[in-house]
């Protein structure tokens, strides 16, 4: 059932490995373009898309965030047995480009499928250090850093 819904989305599914991010714009790029991403300037993003700057290398927070994603997905499965937690590159190709807006892409950290309501939601996992957690609201709130 859930895979039928995924195939009906107006997107092209692509594997993460080998995907050329320079030919489209993703969520992180949008935050840079809007001027709310404190980690990159719009001029650097433009140069990166043009091939004038190398792709950004992963740093420790990015690496550890990625390492925690499987554990967080498992915890969600344990906490909410009526919800299927789908994993990129296992349950679906990890990158999607819009069929209507081909220059737009996303790479969700997963999908949540509620077996009771048959609703599909995007799962985006973020981890925060003790230094950055003050940018986030209390658990369950809708307060999150502007760049997201």
Give the location of each predicted region.
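Charged, glycine-rich intrinsically disordered N-terminal tails and low-complexity linkers that flank
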Residues: 1-71
């Amino acid at each position: 059932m859930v895979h039928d819904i995924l195939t009906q989305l107006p997107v092209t599914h692509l594997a993460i490995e080998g995907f050329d991010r320079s030919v489209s714009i993703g969520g992180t790029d949008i935050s840079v373009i809007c001027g709310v991403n404190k980690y990159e300037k719009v001029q650097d993003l433009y140069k990166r898309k043009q091939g004038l700057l190398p792709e950004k290398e992963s740093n420790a927070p990015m690496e550890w965030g990625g390492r925690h994603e499987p554990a967080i997905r498992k915890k969600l499965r344990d906490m909410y047995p009526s919800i299927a937690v789908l994993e990129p590159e296992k349950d679906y190709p990890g990158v999607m480009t819009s069929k209507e807006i081909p220059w737009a892409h996303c790479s969700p950290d997963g999908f949540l499928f509620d077996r009771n309501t048959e609703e599909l939601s995007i799962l985006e996992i973020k981890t925060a250090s003790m230094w950055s957690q003050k940018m986030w609201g209390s658990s369950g709130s809708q307060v999150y850093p502007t760049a997201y």
